[in-house]
C-alpha cells in the first residue's frame, strides 16, 4: 500500500485508487486523503484492516475492466462509494483534463 501516511491525516473517510501517480494526484493536487496500490490485482487482504474504521472509503476506479473489478471486490469488504471514470480514463487523466474541482464534485466531496 502506497501513501499510508494519509491514513493518519484522513478524517471519517479516505480514498483508494490504483497507481502511485493517481494516489499522489488525489492526495497532493485534489486534496483528498488517499492510499493506493500498484495495480488492480495487488490488493492484500490485510489492507482491509487498515481501512476498516473509516465510515466511508471512496474507490476511484480506473475506467477499464480491472479497475471496475477492483472496485467491486473492495465493495464486498468495506463500506465504499465507487467513483468510476469513463473507459480509458483514471484520476490523473481526469485531473489533467478537468481539474481538481471536477474530481471533488464527482465524489461529492466539497469540504476538502
PLM features: residue spans?
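TOPRIM fold recognition
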Residues: 8-14, 21-112
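Charged, flexible boundary elements
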Residues: 1-5
